[in-house]
Amino acid sequence: MAIGGNKTGKKKITQRKNPDPYLKKEWYPVIAPAHFKSRHIGQTPVTKTAGLRVATDVINHRVYEVNLGDLNPGAEDLNGNTKFYLQTQLVSDGKCLTNFHGMDITRHKYGSLFRKGCDCIDVFMDIPTTDGYLLRVFVIAFTDRFRFQRRKNCHVKGRVIRMMRAGIYETLHNELGKVSIPVLVTKLSNFEVNAKLTEALQKITMCRDVMIRRVKVVKRPRNTMELLSTMHDSNQVRNLAEGQSIQQ
């Protein structure tokens, strides 16, 4: 047979196209608690229910990081530098109802606080709420120069730092130690505790940038369904906040 006479060439290998993974997904809207002005956070994807794998079980306990500037749109600078962590607790009527899971400030805001020639006071305290939560609250504060001060630095003595720490502990205990979690979230979102901390420390020495920089949920109660319904009812949240202000 002549060379090249075999016309049976190699078969073409056709590559199998991978299907789009998002064709098997469904989207659930995420709803924030009633303490915030803009409650619709966005949507979260989850694989559709198939066999023993239920979509609502997979989506439970998901944690979302949301900027406070999106939850409470406004002109306040600190809103855009604060993050809230919200966790899915229940999927009802195709919506993910979330609950408070923590708070933090952004990394660039935290890095911009530090300057030369001042003292940094960093304090944390475990605070139990009236409805069974245990929160770890971190507070940061910096000393500042007095008016018409010639010295460039503003370092203070150890006894002044101890007095500042004691003032922070006392203010946190008075403001957050005897409240429920809905009232606590309201106080964190409108920076009411930051103003109280600044007022308490200004009586001791000059200070700046006194704020709660982080809140961590250490322990939560087992049965939170009743509390979740309270946090997503705007009327009940408003009544709790008004009742707390009247008591104070």
Swiss-Prot record:
Its main location: cytoplasm. InterPro entries: Ribosomal_eS1, Ribosomal_eS1_euk. This is Small ribosomal subunit protein eS1. It comes from the Eukaryota. GO terms for molecular function: structural constituent of ribosome. It comes from Giardia intestinalis (strain ATCC 50803 / WB clone C6) (Giardia lamblia). Belongs to the eukaryotic ribosomal protein eS1 family. GO terms for biological process: translation. Pfam families: Ribosomal_S3Ae. Signal peptide: none annotated. PANTHER family: 40S RIBOSOMAL PROTEIN S3A. It is found in: Cytoplasm. Component of the small ribosomal subunit. Mature ribosomes consist of a small (40S) and a large (60S) subunit. The 40S subunit contains about 33 different proteins and 1 molecule of RNA (18S). The 60S subunit contains about 49 different proteins and 3 molecules of RNA (25S, 5.8S and 5S). GO terms for cellular component: cytosolic small ribosomal subunit. SMART domains: Ribosomal_S3Ae. Keywords: Cytoplasm, Ribonucleoprotein, Ribosomal protein.
